[in-house]
Amino acid sequence: MEDNRKKALGAALSQIERQFGKGAVMKMGDQPREAIPAVSTGSLGLDVALGIGGLPYGRIVEIYGPESSGKTTLTLQVIAEAQKQGKTCAFVDAEHALDPVYAEKLGVNVDELLVSQPDTGEQALEIADMLVRSNAVDVIIVDSVAALTPKAEIEGEMGDSHVGLQARLMSQALRKLTGNVKHANCLMVFINQIRMKIGVMFGSPETTTGGNALKFYSSVRLDIRRIGSVKDGDEVVGNETRVKVVKNKVSPPFRQAEFQIMYGKGIYHMAEVLDMGVKEGFVDKSGAWYAYNGDKIGQGKANACKFLEENLDIANEIEAKVRDKLMPKPVKKETAEAPAEANGELL
């Protein structure tokens, strides 16, 4: 009976391959287990919280939060990090609010960045889909879902009712995009805004725009919030920011990271390296003094960060140690099978 079942399965698989091409159905163990490729977010704490060292290529990601919480800044940092890897990036600016001067300050190579400012939501998503299908773009940012206005709404009158139009548009687009994004190994990030549900008595009244489709299709969802101000004397020079990983299909979810976003500079990376170095025991802190490998690197956090900025090799060394300690290492199938093969050869 078992032989008959195996023969039937073999016949079905060969027929599927003939009809749909090689690789249409395969055993999961046939492919080598590899770490999911990712691009850094520019924040060490967030890279660790995501579990794979950043945002995953070949997946859809949603970043949402209140106004002025750092959503666009975070995505521009992702573009800057991807460009350092030699990747091609595109920014679909549906809000028509991208500032090239600010983007350049965050490390984005604006000369190489593809930018589109579409008129309608349909046009924006069609452009994004064509870029994905070209297999030549590695990171696409859509800013934002709330600004993807359906054509019927733009051509209609101000008071016209267009219930559910945007949700239907997003649902249809994501059905097309999700497979293409995977095949092209492209990271697609949707920025989203928050709205309040009316009449909610229990639970959070907050919801994101564009219906529920994006919540399902996203492999990673990040909730970004401003939790305080960074001050230099009486002057506010930045935001204290908290990011929660509310959904994660590539690593355990519900972790969070806190970091500073400095005005005109972006994520304060050195402060994170220093804080996490102290937390993991790679940097010694005695009173106000910080020391690394027995050598004092500064009195007070500001001086220690300045030292790390001037000595990037030491900063990179501390960061590498933190990543090595906190990032999970994938178990390769080949290494697990190697001893058995060796024993077979000896026999």
UniProtKB/Swiss-Prot annotation:
CDD domains referenced in this protein's UniProt entry, alphabetically: RecA
Source organism, top-level taxon: Bacteria
Gene3D superfamilies on file: P-loop containing nucleotide triphosphate hydrolases
Entry's Gene Ontology BP terms: DNA recombination; DNA repair; SOS response
Residue sites binding ATP per the record: 65-72
InterPro entries: AAA+_ATPase, DNA_recomb/repair_RecA, DNA_recomb/repair_RecA_CS, P-loop_NTPase, RecA-like_C, RecA-like_N, RecA_ATP-bd, RecA_C_sf
SMART domains for the chain: AAA (SM00382)
Keyword Cytoplasm recorded: yes
Keywords assigned by UniProt, alphabetized: ATP-binding, Cytoplasm, DNA damage, DNA recombination, DNA repair, DNA-binding, Nucleotide-binding, SOS response
Entry-linked Pfam families: RecA, RecA_C
Main location: cytoplasm
Subcellular location: Cytoplasm
One GO molecular-function entry: ATP-dependent DNA damage sensor activity
SUPFAM superfamilies assigned: P-loop containing nucleoside triphosphate hydrolases (SSF52540), RecA protein, C-terminal domain (SSF54752)
Gene Ontology CC annotation, any one: cytosol
Function, as annotated: Can catalyze the hydrolysis of ATP in the presence of single-stranded DNA, the ATP-dependent uptake of single-stranded DNA by duplex DNA, and the ATP-dependent hybridization of homologous single-stranded DNAs. It interacts with LexA causing its activation and leading to its autocatalytic cleavage.
Recorded family membership: Belongs to the RecA family.
Protein name: Protein RecA
Species for this entry: Marinobacter nauticus (strain ATCC 700491 / DSM 11845 / VT8) (Marinobacter aquaeolei)
Protein's gene: recA
